């Protein structure tokens, strides 16, 4: 009988039986054991089976794969524990022994018992080592915590001495600042997705997965694919100091940006938008040019282009927290934020516009150069964030006297009333909000009686005879108020009158109007005190209110501006700059005409004041000097412009029948 048939009868497979005493027996040694018993190895580097510490005998080479994983798991604190083959290897040996002779079976059982005893010893050693490791970890953890506390103390000392601080996250119990800006609400797409869903907002704008491009986004705006590639525009921010969690920055213009600013001022004087477009081709992120061109597009009713041009100036900027408002370079940044906020409100994103309003106010809350306090109440009501408006009024009334502004005097009670109309609040909170709303609206009507009749006229509501004929709310109340107060009232009514058109609000307002009339007829001393206060407080509006009125573009408020403001030349990129404006660089003046110039050039300069030869213009870093042909071309263009403006009147040729030109007199 052949060996193949004999193996089949025994149930064995080829390659599993041992070929010899040391043919396929490999011994796995630890590194330390291998070093100690290295000289004792026999020929071929093999170790005898029963010498010293028993290693792992492997009859199948593929069992070595599982042993590597076992060795990695049994490494504790850099030491290796004694172990045997894994269960899979031992079970495999047992399975093969069952099909063999009885002697092999007995040998397999003995090996299994020995393996189990060795495993128990190894597990006991592992438990002891784990306990030691836990003790070591606890000791090292305590020492590391003490080290971190020492590091924190050192950092606090350094911050106190240098003035620099690294603000950490506030504790959970602390309340956020009233002007805290939530970055997730600065993205208008987030608000639009909440209203209409992501599919309706994005639509076909979703790029394919393979063609997806991830541009560098900022908190203020998200760049579009149609925008020019961003490069260093020459506008940078320098950290002045960091103190008590606030960072103070200063905007700096490079030399190239200053040259672009000079070209922009020349383009504005030319009154030609195409010159600004040509400037943007070389300086695509020049802020003043983008603001001016956005206004030109808005006047031409191209709202989409105007909104994109406003978003570009905010792209390269970070969020500054600066105190020096009178510094000229960042004036454009304020205007860009304000105009972007206006576009967001018109787009139907009042929650995002409220965050922009908080951002602008947080940059300079004391000075408030754009007078955002005249607008933040309107944004809060439009966003239906009544709790925020009430909180702002409660925290700032003590030191800012917000009740002296007509917009806060009427918006805060309106917020209380709208809050009392919500059904998800308890009954006692609803009743207290209604009482507070009635109390505040009566104080507002007593302080500003000239608001009622124009408000009812805006809402197309005709008051009853007792109100319209009363002297307190009659026409005299509107005429007798100071001009500065008239500006504030016109600004508030032109912006927020539609918030009062609901029937429930009008019925509530009517009740409180009658309460005020009863107090006036009864001779309440608060009425006379409010009248005296109006005469003292509203003598003349400050410059930031005039600037806010110009930026708002509300016709009624602009018409109420004083004559000294309306007669000034107001530029869209620089409306009513502060009186104490500090210019970081001075625009070079044009060269005055010289007497020894060319006679033809002097003649055309007398006819065309804007004409200048190439030699008289400043050389803005152009290598090679001016070209003579360019001066000749400018001269020819000036001649053509002059000839195009000439108009010749043809003399009447006398008729043949009346050669002397004598006519009959009627």
Curated annotation (Swiss-Prot):
Protein name, as recorded: Ribosome quality control complex subunit TCF25
Location of the protein in the cell: Nucleus; Cytoplasm, Cytosol
Keywords assigned by UniProt, alphabetized: Cytoplasm, Nucleus, Phosphoprotein, Repressor, Transcription, Transcription regulation
Assembly description: Component of the ribosome quality control complex (RQC), composed of the E3 ubiquitin ligase LTN1, TCF25 and NEMF associated with the 60S ribosomal subunit. Interacts (via C-terminus) with NFATC4; the interaction leads to suppresson of NFATC4 transcription factor activity and is reduced following stimulation with angiotensin-2. Interacts with XIAP.
Composition bias type Gly residues, residue spans: 41-53
Organism name: Rattus norvegicus
InterPro entries recorded: TCF25/Rqc1
Sites of Phosphoserine modification: 592
Compositional bias per record (Basic residues), positions renumbered to this chain: 125-137
């Amino acid at each position: 009988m052949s060996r193949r048939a004999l193996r089949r009868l025994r149930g064995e497979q080829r390659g599993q039986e041992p070929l010899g005493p040391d043919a396929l027996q490999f011994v796995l040694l630890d590194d330390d054991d291998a070093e100690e018993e290295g000289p004792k190895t026999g020929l071929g580097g093999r170790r005898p089976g029963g010498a010293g510490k028993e290693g792992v005998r492997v009859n199948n080479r593929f069992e070595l794969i599982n042993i590597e994983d076992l060795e990695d798991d049994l490494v504790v604190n850099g030491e290796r524990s004694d172990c045997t083959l894994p269960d899979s290897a031992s079970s495999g040996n047992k399975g093969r022994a069952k099909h063999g002779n009885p002697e092999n079976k007995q040998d397999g059982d003995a090996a299994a018992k020995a393996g189990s005893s060795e495993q128990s010893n190894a597990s006991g050693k592992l438990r002891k080592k784990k306990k030691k490791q836990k003790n070591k970890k606890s000791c090292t953890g305590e020492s590391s915590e003490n080290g971190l506390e020492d590091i924190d103390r050192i950092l606090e000392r350094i911050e106190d001495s240098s003035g620099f601080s690294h603000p950490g996250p506030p504790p959970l119990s602390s309340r956020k600042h009233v002007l805290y800006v939530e970055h997730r609400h600065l993205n208008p797409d987030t608000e639009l997705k909440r209203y209409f869903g992501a599919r309706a907002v994005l639509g076909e704008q979703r790029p394919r997965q393979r063609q997806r491009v991830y541009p560098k986004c900022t908190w203020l705006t998200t760049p579009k694919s149609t925008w020019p590639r961003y490069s260093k525009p020459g506008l940078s921010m320098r950290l002045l100091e960091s103190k008590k969690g606030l960072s103070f920055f200063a905007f700096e213009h490079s030399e190239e940006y200053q040259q672009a600013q000079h070209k922009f001022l020349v383009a504005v004087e030319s009154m030609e938008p195409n010159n600004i477009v040509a400037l943007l081709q070389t300086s695509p992120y020049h802020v003043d040019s983008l603001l001016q061109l956005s206004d030109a597009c808005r006047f031409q009713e191209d709202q989409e282009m105007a909104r994109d041009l406003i978003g570009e100036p905010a792209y390269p900027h970070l969020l500054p927290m600066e105190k020096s408002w009178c510094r000229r370079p960042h004036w454009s940044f304020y205007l860009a934020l304000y105009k972007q906020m206006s576009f967001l409100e018109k787009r139907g994103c009042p929650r995002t516009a409220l965050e922009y309003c908080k951002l602008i106010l947080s940059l300079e809350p004391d000075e408030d150069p754009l007078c955002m306090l005249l607008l933040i109440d309107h944004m809060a009501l439009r966003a239906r964030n009544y709790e925020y408006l009430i909180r702002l009024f409660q925290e700032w009334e003590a030191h800012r006297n917000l009740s002296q502004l007509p917009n806060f005097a009427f918006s805060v009670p309106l917020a209380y009333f709208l809050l009392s109309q919500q059904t998800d609040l308890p009954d006692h909170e609803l009743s207290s909000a209604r009482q507070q709303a009635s109390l505040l609206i009566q104080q507002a009507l007593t302080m500003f009686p000239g608001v009622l009749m124009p408000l009812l006229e805006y809402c197309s509501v005709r008051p009853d005879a007792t109100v319209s004929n009363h002297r307190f709310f009659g026409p005299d109340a509107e005429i007798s108020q100071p001009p500065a107060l008239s500006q504030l009232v016109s600004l508030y009514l032109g912006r927020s009158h539609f918030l009062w058109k609901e029937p429930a609000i009008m019925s509530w307002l009517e009740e409180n109007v009658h309460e005020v009339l009863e107090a006036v007829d009864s001779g309440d001393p608060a009425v006379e005190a409010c009248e005296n206060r109006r005469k003292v407080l509203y003598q003349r509006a400050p410059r930031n209110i005039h600037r806010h009125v110009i930026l708002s573009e509300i016709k009624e408020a602009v018409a109420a501006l004083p004559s000294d403001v309306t007669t000034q030349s107001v530029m869209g990129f620089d409306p009513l700059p502060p009186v104490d404006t500090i210019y970081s660089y001075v625009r070079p003046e044009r060269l005055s005409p010289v007497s020894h110039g060319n006679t033809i050039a002097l003649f055309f300069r007398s006819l065309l004041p804007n004409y200048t030869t190439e030699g008289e213009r400043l050389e803005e870093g152009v290598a090679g000097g001016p070209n003579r042909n360019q001066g000749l071309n400018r001269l020819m263009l000036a001649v053509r412009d002059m000839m195009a403006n000439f108009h010749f009147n043809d003399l009447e040729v006398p008729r043949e029948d009346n050669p002397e030109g004598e006519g009959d007199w009627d």
